[in-house]
Amino acid sequence: MSVVESLLQFSSTGTLLGALLMLLVLYLLSSGSKSQKEGKEPPGPKPLPLLGNLLTLDLTRPFDTFFELSKSYGNIFQVFLGPKKTVVLVGYKTVKEALVNHAEEFGDRDIAPSFRIMNDEHGIIFSNGENWKEMRRFALSNLRDFGMGKRGSEEKIIEEIQYLKGEFNKFEEKPFDTTQPVNYAVSNIISSIVYGSRFEYTDPQFTEMVDRANENVRVSGSASMMIYNIFPWLGPILKNKRIIVNNIVQSRQQMMKLINGLLETLNPQDRRGFVDSFLIRKQNDEQSGKKDSYFHEENLMMSVTDLFIAGTDTTGTTLRWGLMLMAKYPHIQDRVQEEIDRVIGGRQTVVEDRKKLPYTDAVIHETQRLANIVPMNLPHMTSCDVTFNGYFIKKGTIVVPLLTSVLKDPSEWAKPNSFYPEHFLDETGQFIKRDAFMPFSAGRRMCLGEGLARMELFLFFTSLLQSYRFTTPPGVSGDELDLKGVVGVTVNPSPHKLCAIRRS
């Protein structure tokens, strides 16, 4: 979708002209403000007044445009999204050097308007400074206490697998969309850690909460919201912004009901989940008279939202990619099931089995690599002026560590655009780790739920492949399963249906 089409679709002529005049003033002010002390800037395409390089971008898949631009401008280049300068980092070595070796300088989070309306710089994912440090530290500590990535989580996942199988069985081997049952199952894992209990898949409070969160993730990455992030004064006339705001209002109301229910039965000697721990800390700070505490209602609401969304959408999306890829490539599914049958037999898979299932583990990793569900990462921001690989990048500059360029770096992967599990196998068929495998990002902003996500993917995937043969519907060939995906904040599989055929 072109920029002009996006603007005309959502704005009146008067509003558009007013916005353009405001942009012109900003552009003229900013164009003359560059300090002579600044060093060489990264190269990039010449921007147009007001629009910057927007006419160059495919707004539905901007990461593809960035990847193409790197062929002309190198692994570090800049583009202007309207008046906003954005530095793009491309390739494994460049991204790793920035996020790991220069973690402090590239460690802040850019909070775009579409995310600011959700959190106002509270919570874990979209906050900075001491608030971010305190919330992340508290979340990591308490999630570990409640078994995230450990034995406690394993038991919760194995229990949830049985509920998910029950849902699959209801379709009686007929074609169905895996989206909702998979998302509900994965959401229940984080719900049990955050709230201390799971929900029934028929509970409207739960299903509406999950569906709204998934819709916000999808809509937030739309072309119109990208335009909103650049020209936020267009917000009042954007349909997708209204959808996001409405979902936020309803989700907050439901969340407060759940939190208040936990508050009424709160027992400091018996913490049920993350919310209990936060409420206890909040009460302790209030009783001690601590001023400027970070443990307040807004941080609680947004931390729960962050954990819920991050713990649901990415894992659920990756698992659905994995099932679709098995239907598309039945010969790979054959090898996975042969290995599971030979090593596991009919018993329940456990995390310790991972090292005994090298091919299956390779398939899961290759699914994460090829699915590439967060291709642009979440945007970073420089915390200070920095000279990086000879280029000067000013404090407060938006930085995009292009994860798609890491996971598909041709210098790191033999077949970057193909589904090739051998990327993770040595010549003897044993699993090997790859440094360029970076689906959870890296550095200070690395996904704090990586351990839980890895456990969920392994247990859900192996258990489902142990129980079912996944096929395309009758009359549909594997070639018709599109690998391009649907782009939001994450990249979901294109709409499709699968048949879950029970294995004897």
Predicted regions and their residues:
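Conserved cytochrome P450 K-helix E-x-x-R motif and the immediately C-terminal K′/meander segment
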Residues: 54-74, 253, 347-390, 410, ...
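C-terminal helix/juxtamembrane-tail motif
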Residues: 1-11, 20-24, 277-280, 398, ...
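Cytochrome P450 heme-thiolate monooxygenase catalytic core
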Residues: 108-118, 131, 150-319, 335, ...
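Cytochrome P450 heme-binding "Cys pocket" and the immediately downstream C-terminal segment
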Residues: 330-332, 450-489
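Terminal signal-anchor or tail-anchor transmembrane helices
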Residues: 2-36, 188, 455
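Cytochrome P450 heme-thiolate "Cys pocket" and heme-binding signature region
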Residues: 305, 427-457, 482-486
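Conserved cytochrome P450 K-helix/beta-meander segment immediately N-terminal to the heme-binding cysteine loop
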Residues: 401-429
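Cytochrome P450 substrate-recognition site 1
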Residues: 36-57, 62-153, 177-178, 182-189, ...
